[in-house]
């Protein structure tokens, strides 16, 4: 157990400032000699979970739920206050997605270094790609169990931030940093499955599970990230924040049923496209 000054992080008052750090996962730190990265939970001084400690609320008694998170982000140029490589002539997006070449791709060195460091740390990064907007990137992680999935994403984010320091670049997680323009925002699409989804072989079961999300749209949106209303407009591969839909291969739906799930005889996973990048 360790402690820190919670008043300096706005997590405790100055007169009772101690917060505790409870180690929950450890990873080798590839960029330090004999170093380690320790994921922790924040506790109050009396040992109870701090109100910011969302991890402690996870009921994770087994690893039946598998998660694949797609973390989108912008590499943000602090000099121009625009995405790295953002075109001065407002070139329409389209040439940047999964692109290559100096006129299309900006910041690959950062992305590649982040991938290597994550893999060396034992974080299960499944892939990376340049995203739809200029200076926008994505990496994907996979884990079994909600706590491990969250731990690996947070440590991967930390490593990305630390690498960006060397380039004087900001990692921008705002879901719509370019505002109401004709440019994509950033999400963290959540792919998920359990034994039922992986084995049922039933279109009806998939539709029943998707329909179970319909009555709890507000509850989902409430925990899917700040400023998400700016991103979920119904444009740029999103469904409107006030609507709910699902469909096969439909990236304009709230929940996408991947074509591979269908082609595997309705055995696979679902993708909730609503969570924001932050």
Where do the model's predicted regions map?
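A generic structural motif
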Residues: 42-48, 102-103, 143-149, 194-198, ...
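Core alpha/beta catalytic barrel or barrel-like domain that forms the active/cofactor pocket
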Residues: 68-77, 83-101, 121-141, 171-191, ...
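C-terminal accessory/tail domains of diverse enzymes
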Residues: 1, 148, 159-171, 198-278
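Active-site-proximal structural scaffolding
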Residues: 66, 107, 153-156, 183, ...
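Active-site neighborhood of thiol-dependent amide/isopeptide-bond enzymes
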Residues: 143-155, 178-179
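ATP/Mg2+-dependent ligation/transfer catalytic cores
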Residues: 1-130, 149-155
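Loop-centered beta-sheet repeat module
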Residues: 150-158, 163-174, 185-192
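Acidic/histidine-rich catalytic neighborhood
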Residues: 184-204
